Design a protein with these regions (language model features):
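Alpha-helix N-capping/helix-start residues
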Residues: 28, 60, 153, 229-232, ...
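Short glycine-rich loop/turn motifs that provide flexible caps or phosphate-binding loops at active sites
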Residues: 8, 44, 49-52, 81-84, ...
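Active-site beta->alpha loop and helix N-cap motifs at the rims of alpha/beta catalytic domains
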Residues: 2-148, 158
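C-terminal alpha-helical cap/extension of soluble enzyme domains
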Residues: 6-19, 37, 41-43, 202-205, ...
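Glycine-centered loop/turn motif at secondary-structure junctions
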Residues: 42, 102-104, 163, 185, ...
Length: 283
């Protein structure tokens, strides 16, 4: 029997702090401090090595080490690990290796195969093959702006046929896809686009994975709670105050502005790995 994760609440897709030297080594001490701070703000869980975590610029060994540090600092809160790749058997082996190295990992956030632009049938096959190999539940990550391919509504429902595929992080900006997931009821819907957070939560998303919640974390947690308590007017008022935060966070390619803001607060250096560049002064 496959255990089902509880995805309710505000999840943080973590930045990966780096030392401000040419090597840009991962700053594990800063990461641990940041995770402990964010956990105390009431977040439901974390995502390590997602797009906000600059996973594409980290080696496999670095990613595994980031996961270890995050788990150790999370205080028992669940941690999802970002996962991507084109060859399903290799991605499945990576999931197995990560779970063996870090048994406390709660699950994996898996993108559609990037760059190759497979058919929808190919996407289903890819996810099901990885799910069959994975020892942990999967969250399908629909982010066509990065992968170059949509996970269509019918495809999402086909993914739900596998018991290890339990949720979708929706960055598609397609209300029809979200509505299909909600009507079907087998996948938990997680809001993925920060600028659509209020709308997605109000329409029934059980939780959110929100990068801009590195900033004003407690307020973002409060927003989710207000909507869970059906206090829509209070949520709308709070959202009006949070919208400038989300707009600023994505004024440049993610996560450079978030890192700059956290650096100003003393949590980490604003270092990113090329081809990313530090935030401009105007941001």
């Amino acid at each position: 029997m496959v255990n089902r994760l509880n995805f309710a609440g505000l999840w943080l897709p973590l930045v990966t702090p780096m030392v401000a030297t040419p090597q840009r080594a991962v700053d594990h001490a800063a990461l641990a401090r940041l995770v402990q701070h964010l956990a105390a703000q009431g977040v439901a869980g974390f995502v390590a090595c997602g797009s906000t975590g600059e996973a594409a610029a980290l080696s496999p060994d670095e990613q595994t080490a980031v996961l270890a540090t995050t788990l150790a600092a999370a205080g028992g809160k669940p941690v999802l690990m970002g996962l991507s790749g084109v060859v399903a058997p290799a991605v499945g082996e990576r999931a197995q290796a990560l779970a063996e190295a870090q048994p406390a990992v709660a699950g994996f956030l898996l993108t559609a195969p990037g760059y190759v632009k497979p058919s929808q049938a190919g996407i289903v096959q890819h996810f099901h093959q990885v799910a069959e190999a994975s020892p942990r539940p999967l969250v399908a990550y629909d982010i066509p702006a990065r992968t170059g391919v949509r996970i269509e509504p019918a495809t999402l429902l086909a993914l739900a046929d596998h018991p290890r595929i339990q949720a979708v992080k929706d960055c598609s900006a397609d209300r029809a896809a979200a509505q299909a997931v909600l009507a079907d009821g087998r996948l938990a819907l997680l809001a993925g686009n920060d600028d659509e957070l209020l709308d997605q939560l109000a329409r029934g998303a059980v939780g959110a994975i929100t990068a801009s919640a590195h900033l004003a974390t407690a307020a973002f947690v409060r927003l989710h709670q207000l909507l869970a308590d059906q206090q829509l007017r209070a949520a709308q008022a709070l959202w009006r105050r949070l919208q400038p935060v989300t707009a600023a966070a994505f004024a440049e390619p993610n996560p450079v502005v978030i890192k700059a803001a956290l650096a100003q607060q003393g949590w980490l250096a604003d270092a990113v790995r090329p081809p990313m560049l530090p935030a401009a002064a105007a941001s």
